[in-house]
Amino acid sequence: MPIILFSPSLAIFFSSDDWFHLRVSAITHLSEFSNFFSFIRNPQSIAFYRPLTTQVFFFAFQKLFGVNPTPFHIFVLTCFAFSLYLIFRLSKKLQKTNEKALICTILYGFSVSNFTRLYFLSAFQEVGLVIFSLLCIESYLDNRKYRPIIFFVLALLSKETAVVTPLILFVLDWAKKKIEIRKLTPYLLVLFPYLYLRLFVFGVVSGETYVWNPSPLKAANTLIWYILWSVGAPELLVDYIGNGFRPIARFFSDFPGWWPIILGLLVLNLTFLGYLFAKKLGRFNRRFASFIVLFIISLLPVLFLPQHKFTLELGLPLVWFCFAVARLLPEKGKILAFFLVAYLTLNLSMNHLTYARHYSVGRGVVSKKVFEYFSKNYSTRPQNSYFEFINDTRVYTKEWGSSRQIANSVGGSELFRVLYRDQNYNVYYEDFLEVRPALQRIPISSKIFLQ
């Protein structure tokens, strides 16, 4: 059922960062493939070190299927289905019953926070991270010797937030009252060299959204948002909440029909979870406490980045959230039925709202129009001239003109670099005051792609 819920993603075209990743991964030599995994910056490097789930992913599917996003999406959904199977298996191992495992899988599978991870192809790294992290954890709990280390390395190659895995394993051992530091040593021997190479050789990402803020209050605010998103709040809600968690006036005008549904269902779910938590207060064991701690630990890489909070970061943390909620719920009966109805109603309705508002959908539509237009009308790049998208509609603000909307959808010049197979090809946008080349200008209407 969750696969059916997110199956509309199959129709979503490439957009934004997808084009950059397609361009970088379009290699022709074996040495370029090895560049994917190098910690030394090179032409095949991207902003983050995620070679397995980004460069290799885009390279393999582009090589097999060209610029056709459907096979990419089929693979992503297949991996998501496999991650649900792994969640069921791990939950059964930790919570001992099929009923609890099924509850966890339902909660995770229908969560609206999965939207970005499944609709935006460049977010596939989160799905890969979840798969390899869960395989590592399960193999570790089964006392496998080498397999969990291999999966840990694959998780690190998927996304850097896998660095919390050894700490997750430590907490799971603590929950069993059986901590073996020697057993964790191999993970540290992998982790410390990785951290050195990742931070000091590959380097860190700069930018306003990646500035660390050690403020406990900011971290608490960020944690609250990840909890709200885990319950089912739409990601867009963060843009409409002011000081004291009060909705700003624009929230009610932008969502006249939706705001009662959003707030009503969210409050209902939070109230019911609060009731279940209070009901079991004082009767919690180490296992439940470990799930709460693991939720926070999994968020540590982003918890102190208040300007960089997004639902796609919930891939691994959501696993522990669902485990904790399942721990609060009975295995059958009216209470379970009531909560599942409330939870599914919130998340299914927010999935519908998110589809109508999410950038991956809107930008995908624009990007497809641009790609098809230029494939038909300019299948070969014109000589001694350049394209410039102009602002020919007043629908958008001065700061976010129509040409900027196009630029955000196609990744600036990246779509054209893929289309014309030229790593250095540039197009221009009226909103961006760049120096134009001394060539003939070909103005392109932005309006025709935004209708």
Where are these regions (language model features)?
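Polytopic membrane enzymes that build or remodel cell-surface glycoconjugates and lipids
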Residues: 1-451
